[in-house]
């Protein structure tokens, strides 16, 4: 290993890519195809390579007509409206529209580089017009990209933790890497930072969120601790985004602290009544279609006492959503279910009785906004409001599940990172480490992959062009 380390350190690479997920691989592939000599440094072991991309399912894509597995049309303006709705306008509109437009050419590019897509999934994640789902999920996408990168001659090193970005003025001269129990400096003519956010650093989360963050679960990789982001911010790089903003969904409270992935997400919320630990409802469970609302529920649960809540359904709804990896808690009565979940039984019974009394007759359509709403209830439920009255009853404990954070590095449309006195000469960024440039708050299903793919490709091309 010492010989390999020495060889890495003695080589001045054309492009060094820091990170090993979707954005990093897109950058490495584009740079290598442009003729650059590329080194990719992945901090995780090979078995855990890929950051949060290991857990992804789909890619949101603009298209003017049917394309590959996508149906119908999803044009720039509709895509942009969807983004504005979830971000409440907290976005760089120029970069957002640029990303949306660029997404159209990404899907065929992905297919050319080995990514395969599947027909759209059924149930609440049916997004055949807007999102293309990966056949085999995120790991299959990563395997395809790693194979492509290797075939192109990219040098890939695992368990290579970048601890510093060494600057001379506005230029990066090298990165400091901890590997094989020692630190080495590796020089590069251009650097792409694609190492993710800081969501796995609980202390950093707690500085932003307060003590409540200690109860959060990190459904993404445990390797995204924000070291590269921190050294860049400490060096004066311009930041973008709010440290309290993140992609945070409601996941099963029984999930592990780290790396539970997308299979821990609870998708029954639109068909449920959600109670806090006191047995009280606190938000409209049927506000909108689930793909447009699932990403707000982590923050909603985070605001509840002890950062926990409980989704309760009855037997009418058990087959309407994609199940979590954990089976629901099951009981024949609401009181029994409440006791099993740890909710005051009397309060839970009262809340659900009030909800049931507020439900009105009408046509129920689980895959579209059906207007089946409660009357005289606060908070209301404005769609899919059916009485919870048919045993057996089922419950899931909910916790905030953080996927990635939005505080990041400010970039321009060429993915170049902004320093204290203007753009750095040879530093680009892609993926979660710069996603706050576009995602000021909220989330749109599949859009993180869009940002990573678009800006990864741009960063790789620009870095290679700088060298050439």
Name every feature range the model reports, one short phrase each.
Residues 158-171:
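A conserved short coil-to-beta-strand element within the FAD-binding core of flavoproteins
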Residues 10-13, 180-190, 423:
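Core beta-strand elements of the Rossmann-like FAD/NAD(P) dinucleotide-binding domain
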Residues 37, 43-155, 159, 272-281, ...:
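Conserved N-terminal/central alpha/beta ligand/cofactor-binding core
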Residues 225, 229-349:
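An anion/pyrophosphate-binding glycine-rich loop and adjacent beta-alpha core
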Residues 1-15, 33, 438, 442, ...:
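Extreme N-terminal leader/targeting segments of oxidoreductases
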Residues 347-441:
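A glycine-rich dinucleotide-binding beta-alpha-beta segment and adjacent secondary-structure elements
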Residues 8-23, 39:
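Beta1/beta-strand and adjacent pyrophosphate-binding region of the FAD-binding site
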Residues 182, 186-252, 449, 458, ...:
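Glycine-rich loop(s) and the adjacent beta-strand/alpha-helix scaffold that form part
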């Amino acid at each position: 290993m010492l010989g390999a380390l020495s060889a890495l350190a003695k080589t001045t690479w054309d492009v060094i890519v820091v990170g090993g997920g979707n954005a990093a691989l897109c950058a490495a592939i584009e740079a290598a195809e442009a003729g650059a000599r590329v080194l990719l440094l992945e901090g995780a072991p090979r078995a855990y390579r890929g950051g949060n991309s290991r857990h992804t399912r789909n890619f949101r894509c603009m298209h003017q007509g049917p394309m590959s597995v996508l149906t119908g049309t999803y044009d720039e303006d509709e895509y942009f409206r969807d983004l504005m709705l979830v971000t409440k306008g907290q976005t760089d509109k120029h970069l957002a529209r640029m990303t949306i437009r660029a997404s159209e050419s990404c899907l065929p590019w992905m297919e050319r580089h080995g990514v395969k897509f599947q027909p759209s999934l059924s149930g609440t994640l049916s997004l055949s017009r807007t999102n293309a789902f990966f056949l085999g999920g995120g790991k299959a996408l990563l395997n395809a990209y790693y194979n492509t990168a290797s075939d192109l001659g990219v040098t890939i090193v695992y368990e290579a933790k970048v601890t510093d970005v060494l600057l001379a003025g506005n230029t990066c001269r090298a990165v400091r890497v901890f590997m094989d129990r020692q630190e080495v400096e590796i020089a590069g003519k251009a650097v792409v930072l694609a190492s993710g956010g800081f969501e796995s650093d609980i202390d950093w989360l707690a500085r932003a969120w307060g003590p409540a963050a200690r109860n959060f679960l990190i459904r993404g990789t445990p390797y995204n601790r924000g070291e590269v982001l921190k050294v860049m911010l400490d060096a004066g790089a311009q930041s973008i985004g709010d440290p309290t903003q993140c992609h945070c969904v409601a996941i099963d409270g029984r999930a592990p602290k780290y790396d539970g992935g997308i299979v821990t997400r609870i998708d029954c919320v639109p068909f449920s009544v959600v109670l806090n630990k006191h047995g009280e409802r606190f938000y409209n469970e049927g506000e909108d279609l689930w793909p447009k609302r699932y990403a707000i529920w982590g923050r909603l649960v985070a605001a509840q006492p002890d950062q926990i809540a409980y989704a309760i359904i009855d037997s009418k709804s058990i087959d309407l959503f994609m199940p979590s990896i954990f089976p629901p808690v099951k009981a024949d009565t609401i009181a029994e279910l409440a006791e099993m979940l740890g909710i005051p039984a009397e309060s839970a019974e009262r809340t659900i009785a009030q909800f049931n009394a507020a439900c009105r007759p009408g046509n129920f359509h689980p895959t579209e906004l059906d207007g089946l709403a409660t009357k005289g209830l606060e908070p209301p439920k404005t769609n899919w409001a059916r009485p919870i009255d048919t045993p057996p009853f089922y419950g899931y404990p909910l916790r905030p599940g953080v996927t990635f954070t939005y505080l990041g590095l400010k970039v321009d449309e060429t993915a170049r990172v902004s320093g204290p006195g203007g753009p750095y000469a040879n530093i680009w960024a892609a993926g979660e480490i710069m996603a706050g440039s576009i995602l000021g708050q909220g989330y749109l299903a599949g859009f993180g992959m869009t940002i990573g793919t678009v800006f990864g490709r741009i960063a790789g091309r620009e870095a290679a062009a700088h060298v050439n």
